[in-house]
Amino acid sequence: MNTKHRYITGFDGIRTIAVLGVIFYHLFPNTIKGGYLGVPVFFVISGYLIIDLLRQEWESNQKIHLKAFYFRRIKRLYPALIGLLVLCASYITLFQRNLLNNLRGVVFSSLLYFNNYWQIDNKLSYFDRFHNPDPFTHLWSLSVEAQNYLVLPILLVLFYKLGRKKDRVAGIFLLGSLASAIWMAIQFKPGVDPTAVYDGTFSRSFSMWLGASLAIFYQVIIYAQVFLKKPKKR
C-alpha cells in the first residue's frame, strides 16, 4: 500500500473560509455572529492531518518516531510564533505601553504553550475586546493546538502497541471528543464571561479529537470498500 502523505487540496479552501469567518467576526461582531466557528474548523482539520500522517507512518514502518514528529512541529511552529511575539512586543512598546507589565508572562506562556491557561488565570477576557484590547489574545488557540499535538500522537502509539483495531481507536477518539463537548456544555453558564470555557483545553479539544477520529474512520471505510470490491472465490 502506498503510504505517501496525501496533500488534500480541499482543506485549503476550508481553511480560507475559516480564516475569513474569524476575521469578519472580529471586524463585524454584531453582523457575522458565527464567524468564530472558524476556530473549531481549524482544529478539526489539524487533528485530522496529524493523525492521518502518523497513521501512514505506522502502516509503513510499524513504528512512529515521536521525537522526529515533535521536532518537526517545533521547527514549523516556533519561527512564526517568535516572529509574531517580536512584532507584537514592538507594537505595544510603541503604542500600548500599559500592556508591558504582562509582556514577560505572555512570552513565557506562549513559548511553552500554556498561554490559554495563563490568560484564564489572569482574568483576561477573550470577549472584552473594547475594554481589554490585547494583540496577544488569540495565542490561546495555538496553545490548545500544541497541547493536543503533544497528547494525541502518544495516545495513538499506545493504542497501536496495545493492538487496538482501527475502528476501536477511532471510537476512543470520538468518545474523547464527545466528553470534551459535554464538559464545555456543563461549564458554560449564561450571564458569566465564558472565556474559561472558550480558552480551556479540556472544553476545546473536542474539535481536534473529532478530526483525529475522522482520520481513522476514513481509513476504515477505505479498507472496507477495497475488501468488498475483491472478487469472491468460488
What are these regions (language model features)?
Residues 1-234:
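Membrane-interface helix/loop caps of multi-pass membrane proteins
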